[in-house]
């Protein structure tokens, strides 16, 4: 009996042809699945002044979330895009200070600074936000931080400086991945003083910090996502 769906000039596929067609379909399907599985996942990021900041990172084996970003200025100049990473998002300076665990201030440099300029700015800002008693108590620590900055001859646009508080290890600073501070108690470059780091945080989220920068780092302003969309302020 003839097949009504086969034209007069067509012949039914042989068993071998059907097998080959099935194999081709299987290989094509497998390749498509593999492509989906191995396609690299693009990390979510926000953008400010052309700088892309990842919304989640891993540092010292711990996951951190982006709390906020802000533009830091020096006079009329744009100095850096600052990012604050925390274990959990917080919207007040007091809550950030009380938070246990790893914290990171990340500076994405927008213009060139020499090490002497960086040290001078740091000391002036630190003295402004610390009490007289705190400044006197931490004078040796301030000297250590100044020595760490001296290891960086200059920073230029595109450089990344991370300033971390790591429980049990202390204040860890890196410039483009190069470590500037020590993490052993006997190391003269080790800075294991949490008060000093909290005072450093005040420079960015304390009452003396510019309101625009402070609100941005505390997640109180909208952040623009790379590729479209926004990260809205915390309620």
Language-model features, listed with the residues they occupy:
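Short strand-turn-strand beta-turns centered on an Asx-Gly dipeptide
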Residues: 175-177
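Flexible glycine-rich active-site/ligand-binding loops centered on an Asp-His dyad
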Residues: 183-211
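N-terminal secretory signal peptides
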Residues: 1-21, 30-36, 45-97
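Mid-length scaffold segments of soluble, non-membrane domains
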Residues: 90, 95-162, 166
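Soluble periplasmic/extracytoplasmic beta-strand elements of cell-envelope proteins
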Residues: 65, 83-85, 104-108, 172
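Cysteine/selenocysteine-centered motifs that mediate thiol-based redox chemistry or coordinate metal-sulfur cofactors
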Residues: 212-235
């Amino acid at each position: 009996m003839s097949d009504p769906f086969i034209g007069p000039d067509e012949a039914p596929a042989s068993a071998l042809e059907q097998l080959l067609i099935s194999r081709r379909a299987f290989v094509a399907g497998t390749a498509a699945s593999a492509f989906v599985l191995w396609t690299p996942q693009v990390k979510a990021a926000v953008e400010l002044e052309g700088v892309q900041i990842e919304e989640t990172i891993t540092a010292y084996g711990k996951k951190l979330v982006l709390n906020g970003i802000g533009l830091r200025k020096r006079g009329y100049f744009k100095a850096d895009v600052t990012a604050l990473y925390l274990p959990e998002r917080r919207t007040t300076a007091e809550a950030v200070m009380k938070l246990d665990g790893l914290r990171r201030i990340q500076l994405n440099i927008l213009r060139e600074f020499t090490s002497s300029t960086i040290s001078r700015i740091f000391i002036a800002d630190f003295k402004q936000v610390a009490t007289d008693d705190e400044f006197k108590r931490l004078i040796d620590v301030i000297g250590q931080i100044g020595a760490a900055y001296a290891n960086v001859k200059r920073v230029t646009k595109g450089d990344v400086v991370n300033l971390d508080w790591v429980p049990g290890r202390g204040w860890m600073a890196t410039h483009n991945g190069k470590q500037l501070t020590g993490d052993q108690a006997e190391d003269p470059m080790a800075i294991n003083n949490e008060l000093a780091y909290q005072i450093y945080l005040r420079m960015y989220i304390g009452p003396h910090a510019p309101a625009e920068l402070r609100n941005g780092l505390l997640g109180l302003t909208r952040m623009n996502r790379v590729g479209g969309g926004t990260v809205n302020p915390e309620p």
